[in-house]
Amino acid sequence: MPIVDSGSVSPLTAADKTKILAAWDLVYKNYEKNSVDILVKFFTGTPAAQAFFPKFKGLTTADDLKKSSDVRWHAERIINAVNDAVKSMDDTEKMSMKLKELSNKHVKNFNVDRKYFKVLAGVIADTVAPGDASFEKLMSIICILLNSAY
């Protein structure tokens, strides 16, 4: 299923959750490296998104991005937010609350264009479980919630 960022998707099934956890655990066990790789891939594929991060100004190459402590810090925040969602799959109210709070922060404090959530979700899904409908469903749920304040 392609990742969507509006409307609704069916709830995660027990089988979805099992697949998601298996794939996620493989990536998250090396979250420092994988988080940076994901964010660098996002910025190199979508350079306009980097404009929302003043601290990343002047980081023009993948190598520059990988070496930046600010990039590493933000990459870990992103992967930990996804990890929180993965760990909250059985508590959708908790997941919803946290992601809606994150949505509000990105609107009010950072004025981030919401289209980038879906792009980043695609990079994450391609890294964690390429082509896996269960993981794409989770990323759709995350995107829909991140768009809630827009």
Swiss-Prot record:
Listed Pfam families: Globin
InterPro entries documented for this protein: Globin (IPR000971), Globin-like_sf (IPR009050), Globin/Proto (IPR012292), Globin_lamprey/hagfish (IPR013314)
Superkingdom assignment: Eukaryota
Residues holding heme b: 74, 106
GO molecular function terms listed in the Swiss-Prot or TrEMBL record: heme binding; iron ion binding; oxidoreductase activity; oxygen binding; oxygen carrier activity
PANTHER family named in the record: CYTOGLOBIN, CYTOGLOBIN-1-RELATED
Recorded family membership: Belongs to the globin family.
Protein name: Globin-3
Source organism of the structure: Mordacia mordax (Southern hemisphere lamprey)
